[in-house]
Amino acid sequence: MKILIVDDDKDIVQLLEIYVRNEGYDPITAYNGKEALTKLNTNPDISLVILDIMMPEMDGMEVIKQVRKDSSIPILVVSAKTTDMDKIQGLITGADDYVTKPFNPLEVMARVKSLLR
């Protein structure tokens, strides 16, 4: 299964890439929202998206809105936006789950597995 990891912080992308690969998934990476939409369009077999909110060019909320126009792919937000209202807004916009930074990679992977059940 392919998992798209989207974050403008290369260190976070690399960390999540390691955990995703160690769990037997095939990671695909993007560093902003526009790149994420391109990857989703060119890889229709992506099973899940791990998505940051605050990114250049196109933020994660806009990515969620665009994806939700024609897809029900699971979206797990991993964001530094930590207030209850941030989480609620992410879920209302169309995210399936929301984890705040700093995060425990084991928790993120548990949520990935849960969303892929």
What do the predicted segments below correspond to?
Residues 29-48:
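Acidic, metal-coordinating helix/loop segments flanking the phosphotransfer/catalytic sites
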Residues 1-4, 116:
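Non-catalytic signal-transmission and effector/linker regions of two-component phosphorelay proteins
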Residues 10-28:
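Two-component/phosphorelay signaling modules centered on CheY-like receiver
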